[in-house]
């Protein structure tokens, strides 16, 4: 019986998106710009799976520090996104075979971002005295700006971004983690009709500006996908096991998930992934999201941190390869870009890498994929699930 291992390097785009100009992202290239800004970038194991060549096929240029003719042990491709947005939810859903062909609701105003009637209902339902923020911001900046005031007043911090999100930051100790989660559940309910993809709980600790730190107790409250993902169909049709490591379960609104494994940070995410692969039986999908590439490095525009994170992942990749059985299929991919050299702090519209490894995967270029949904269709075919509506199987 077969297993599929999906490693989602959150935000690890490889440039080249033909519609990037529509998003203000023409020229954005997460991998390419990391490579060009680093005096050295050593990713030999990802390179052997075709990362550099996938990037070259994507944008026409081999990233710095990569070889034109590496020793290939896996198949490689790049994929275009057909979903209307460049957000986490759209990318993950499309990868699972359900592209987002509608427009998410947004809060476009930089200040006073949320409608007053919505805020009034939230305040009344939650029994809070008010709120701080109500603006666009990156998570770390707003903590420095409003964290101390939040601790003094007890008012939660509301903020958003270019994505379809309503984010709430609150101190774990002075506000309380459960209080934050309960508030997020109220907001999720009140957002009905606004078509907002996620409410995100952003707990933090610390006692003064410059010392505040977000914790690993983040929680995403997503809407459910509009159709069955390959994960759901695998469970229903094949009685399969789907193991979520990290925030995968939250992104799919806990649909199509058999087991949830919490982990924080690249090291723990990799450790937990290895544990689950070791213990997983046949007929299993292990799906891990390495969120730190996005949250810690991409949004914070930390080129060096992103590069070091990639090198850490690459160093540990052989541990995963050694655990693979003859009938296992490994897919390493991303959900969007977040170029750490780009202006602002938002995601960037880019192609994603699709790196595949397994006994049945030819070591060659596997094509320019017209949708992320080709990944979901590949998983469906490999595991004997009925075909998805979107996508073409890669192998």
Curated annotation (Swiss-Prot):
<dbReference type="GO" id="GO:0006018">
    <property type="term" value="P:2-deoxyribose 1-phosphate catabolic process"/>
</dbReference>
<comment type="function">
    <text>Isomerase that catalyzes the conversion of deoxy-ribose 1-phosphate (dRib-1-P) and ribose 1-phosphate (Rib-1-P) to deoxy-ribose 5-phosphate (dRib-5-P) and ribose 5-phosphate (Rib-5-P), respectively.</text>
</comment>
<keyword id="KW-0464">Manganese</keyword>
<feature type="binding site">
    <location>
        <position position="10"/>
    </location>
    <ligand>
        <name>Mn(2+) 1</name>
    </ligand>
</feature>
<comment type="pathway">
    <text>Carbohydrate degradation; 2-deoxy-D-ribose 1-phosphate degradation; D-glyceraldehyde 3-phosphate and acetaldehyde from 2-deoxy-alpha-D-ribose 1-phosphate: step 1/2.</text>
</comment>
<keyword id="KW-0413">Isomerase</keyword>
<dbReference type="GO" id="GO:0009117">
    <property type="term" value="P:nucleotide metabolic process"/>
</dbReference>
<dbReference type="GO" id="GO:0043094">
    <property type="term" value="P:metabolic compound salvage"/>
</dbReference>
<dbReference type="InterPro" id="IPR010045">
    <property type="entry name" value="DeoB"/>
</dbReference>
<feature type="binding site">
    <location>
        <position position="347"/>
    </location>
    <ligand>
        <name>Mn(2+) 2</name>
    </ligand>
</feature>
<feature type="binding site">
    <location>
        <position position="336"/>
    </location>
    <ligand>
        <name>Mn(2+) 1</name>
    </ligand>
</feature>
<dbReference type="Pfam" id="PF01676">
    <property type="entry name" value="Metalloenzyme"/>
</dbReference>
<dbReference type="InterPro" id="IPR006124">
    <property type="entry name" value="Metalloenzyme"/>
</dbReference>
<feature type="binding site">
    <location>
        <position position="335"/>
    </location>
    <ligand>
        <name>Mn(2+) 1</name>
    </ligand>
</feature>
<feature type="binding site">
    <location>
        <position position="294"/>
    </location>
    <ligand>
        <name>Mn(2+) 2</name>
    </ligand>
</feature>
<comment type="similarity">
    <text>Belongs to the phosphopentomutase family.</text>
</comment>
<keyword id="KW-0963">Cytoplasm</keyword>
<dbReference type="GO" id="GO:0006015">
    <property type="term" value="P:5-phosphoribose 1-diphosphate biosynthetic process"/>
</dbReference>
<keyword id="KW-0479">Metal-binding</keyword>
<protein>
    <recommendedName>
        <fullName>Phosphopentomutase</fullName>
        <ecNumber>5.4.2.7</ecNumber>
    </recommendedName>
</protein>
<feature type="binding site">
    <location>
        <position position="299"/>
    </location>
    <ligand>
        <name>Mn(2+) 2</name>
    </ligand>
</feature>
<dbReference type="InterPro" id="IPR017850">
    <property type="entry name" value="Alkaline_phosphatase_core_sf"/>
</dbReference>
<dbReference type="GO" id="GO:0030145">
    <property type="term" value="F:manganese ion binding"/>
</dbReference>
<dbReference type="GO" id="GO:0008973">
    <property type="term" value="F:phosphopentomutase activity"/>
</dbReference>
<dbReference type="InterPro" id="IPR024052">
    <property type="entry name" value="Phosphopentomutase_DeoB_cap_sf"/>
</dbReference>
<dbReference type="GO" id="GO:0005829">
    <property type="term" value="C:cytosol"/>
</dbReference>
<dbReference type="GO" id="GO:0000287">
    <property type="term" value="F:magnesium ion binding"/>
</dbReference>
């Amino acid at each position: 019986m077969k297993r599929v291992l999906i490693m989602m390097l959150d935000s690890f785009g490889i440039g080249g998106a033909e519609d990037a100009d529509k998003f203000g992202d023409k020229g954005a290239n997460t991998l390419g710009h990391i490579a060009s800004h680093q005096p050295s970038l050593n990713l030999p194991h990802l390179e052997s799976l075709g990362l550099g060549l996938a990037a070259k096929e994507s944008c026409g240029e081999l990233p710095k520090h990569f070889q034109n003719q590496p020793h290939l042990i896996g198949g490689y491709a790049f994929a275009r996104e057909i979903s209307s947005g460049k957000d986490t939810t759209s990318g993950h859903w499309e990868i699972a075979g359900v592209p987002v062909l509608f427009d998410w609701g947004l809060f476009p105003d930089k200040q006073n971002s949320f409608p007053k009637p919505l805020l009034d209902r939230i305040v009344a339902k939650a029994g809070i005295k008010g709120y701080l923020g109500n603006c666009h911001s990156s998570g770390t900046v707003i903590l420095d700006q409003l964290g101390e005031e939040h601790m003094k007043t007890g008012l939660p911090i509301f903020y958003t971004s270019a994505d379809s999100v309503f984010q709430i930051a609150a101190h774990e100790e002075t506000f309380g983690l459960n209080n934050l989660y309960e508030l997020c559940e109220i907001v999720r309910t009140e957002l009905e009709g606004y078509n907002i993809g996620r409410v995100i709980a952003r707990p933090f600790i610390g006692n003064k500006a410059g010392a505040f730190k977000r914790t690993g107790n983040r929680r995403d409250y997503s809407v459910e996908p509009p159709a069955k993902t390959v994960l759901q169909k695998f469970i229903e049709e094949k009685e399969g096991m789907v193991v979520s490591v990290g925030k995968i379960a939250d992104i799919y609104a806990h649909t199509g998930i058999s087991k949830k494994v919490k982990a924080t940070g690249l090291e723990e995410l990799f450790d937990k992934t290895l544990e689950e692969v070791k213990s997983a039986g046949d007929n299993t999908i292990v799906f891990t999201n390495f969120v730190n590439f996005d949250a810690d490095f991409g949004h914070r525009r930390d080129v060096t941190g992103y590069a070091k994170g990639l090198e850490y992942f690459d160093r540990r990749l052989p541990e995963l390869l050694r655990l693979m059985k003859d009938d296992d299929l490994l897919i390493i991919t991303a959900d969007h870009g977040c170029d750490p050299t780009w202006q602002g702090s938002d995601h960037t519209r880019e192609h994603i890498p699709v790196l595949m490894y397994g006994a049945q995967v030819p070591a060659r270029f596997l094509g320019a994929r017209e949708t992320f949904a080709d990944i979901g269709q590949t998983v469906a075919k490999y595991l004997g699930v009925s075909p998805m509506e979107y996508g073409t199987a890669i192998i």
